Amino acid sequence: LPPGGCGEAWNLDAPEKVLAIQRAYADAGSDCLITNTFGASRIMLDRHDEGERTQAINRAAVEIARRAFGGRPGYVLGDIGPFGGLMEPYGDIPVALVEKAFGEQAEALVSAGIDAIIIETQTSLEELGVAIAAAQAAGAPCIIGSMAFDRLREGDEVRTMMGTSPEQAAAFMAEAGCHVLGLNCGSGIDMRIAADTARRYRSVSGLPIMAQPNAGLPVLENLKVIYRETPDEMAAGVPALLDAGARIIGGCCGSTPAHIRRFREIVDHVRHQDRARA
């Protein structure tokens, strides 16, 4: 994919490449696969002159993710990412335009047979609320809201870009009708900070928690962003995430099938220990 290219268009133009990537994660032990639709709202696709293929791109993504399981049990999560701007009154994008774009994407994902919609890497509760309403209107069987927090310069405190705390985010998502409270990506969010954020979610709501941290902190090498945390290093934080209340654990930027394979091993080991103690 060339820099600035439209990866979501690969669902139609290079489906076997997308399938190979997702199959690698399924083979590594993933129970859930997120569709290749993070930037597949019409607003985002229009920037690549792909808007007219919005529905086809989203439907194809669901089919590819389902195929990646190869007949094994698994959950397909239809991904809705940010639309890449700010809604009025903070920005110049009309709320009605975002409602229409998210509504179209949610309807395409639901009609294609997703098991849940995940609305991820959100920093604005207003935008998240529009996406949740779109998922509800489309009849999504399960809705996961997932916020992206940034670690502040001093200490371990985190906020979204718009200043939202984990407690505020958890309360909003629960009230808005999410079935799962998620956190993913962000700046300076490693496994330890992710576990702390999950505990803060838990202090507000008893809903299930999903955590997808990055593979450590990014560094710039030869004009490329590199995440150096190895599968073993990242997996060492899985028990703390489980103890904090996370029930769905994955990886975001920098994570690979090798990371997920180690996650799977740790989760299975913890489950075995829990059964042995029961």
Where are these regions (language model features)?
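Domain-level signal for soluble alpha/beta catalytic cores
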Residues: 1-278
